[in-house]
Amino acid sequence: MTEPLRLGVIGLSTKGWASTHLVPPLLGPPLSSHYKLLAVSTTNPTSAEASAAKYSTANTTVKAYHTPESIASDPDLDIVAVSVKTPNHVENATKVIEAGKDLFIEWPAGRGLKETKLLAGLAKAKGIRTIVGLQARQSALFRKVKKLVEEGKIGDVLSTSMTSRIPGPHAPWGPTVFKGSEYLLKKDNGATLLDIPGGHFFEAFTYILGPIDTISATAVVQHASSQVVNPDGTPTGEVIPVDSPSQVAVSGTLKSGAVISLHWRAGLETPSNVKAATPLLWVIDGTKGSIRIESDHPLAALVEMYEPTQLWVNGEEVKVEDDGKTNEGRAWEEYLKGEGAGDHADLQHAVKIKSIIDAIWRSAKGGVKVSL
């Protein structure tokens, strides 16, 4: 048996995304015998010590750091994961790359196409392996759909349409925002409705249907300001300006010639349990039939986290077996297969997804059709 990969995580505190989604699959079987968490880093020494204490075991003492340089230079680590807010991606990931460590980085892997290209170039020049938190392709349902399309179950794809919604109250990109999430409402921070839900969807979309050819887009800011609220929903009294769109609509064509129509909606108040307000509905029409993907989960627009479970093919419901794994866990499993063997996103692939998003921004800003 090979030795487990020695892992450090930047941004792993006692709560938050890394502690609830990224790391848990690594702490139990089957992955716990292949990965070993040895170090954490946060900007606050106190929180770093608390996190290290939480993840230490009887056999392993997790080290606490509070700078990216210190954890990246730890000789006892093979790979370092960066799980911090988007504006801090480049600063932290660059330190890991410079130290010659393999890198996991959360999507969107930097602000805009320029920063993602920068990281991809640095990683390639250094010769390190990378894995990016674009996990939607790991979904058992999406893999099933990909197989159905490739096997010609619905014939040649003619068109595809998707609508998704993120309901209130206090969800991102709406009239109110939880304290600590204000950065999502500034477009230049690279964590918009298009960057996050959109980017993850395009990962599944292109994985199943192939590359996009042309795009025409509309992005609208319908809430010029947002009221900041506490975790319990009470207002803090602060109101911040918003330049991040709450509505993004995209039409265009695939390289195959199929027509696409996609619409992301946020800041909505219609209850998520109202059928007319289905959080995710994706239809793929072909010459021999259609595929319908649906989810009633309130946050189904975040396809990387909340896998759709309802699938119909030519009007018949198809059940997809639940293996009990998460998309994050499946991605970590793929990484173990080695360079070029595992089916997971890396920084070079992230550039391709970011190029789609960049084309949408350019189309929406200029009111023009953009070719990819």
Region locations from a protein language model:
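Contiguous beta-strand/loop segments that form the cofactor/metal-binding neighborhood of enzyme cores
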Residues: 196-300, 332-341
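Short acidic low-complexity segments
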Residues: 63-73
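Predominantly a Rossmann-like dinucleotide-binding segment in NAD(P)-dependent oxidoreductases
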Residues: 16, 136-241, 367
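N-terminal Rossmann-like dinucleotide-binding module
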Residues: 1-58
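Core-facing hydrophobic residues within beta-strands of well-ordered domains
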Residues: 35-37, 59, 77, 157, ...
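Beta-strand-loop-alpha-helix segment that lines the small-molecule cofactor/substrate pocket
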Residues: 79, 85-138, 152
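Residues that mark the start of a beta-strand
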Residues: 4-8, 156-159, 290
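C-terminal helix-rich "cap/oligomerization" subdomain common to oxidoreductases
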Residues: 2-4, 32, 56, 79-81, ...
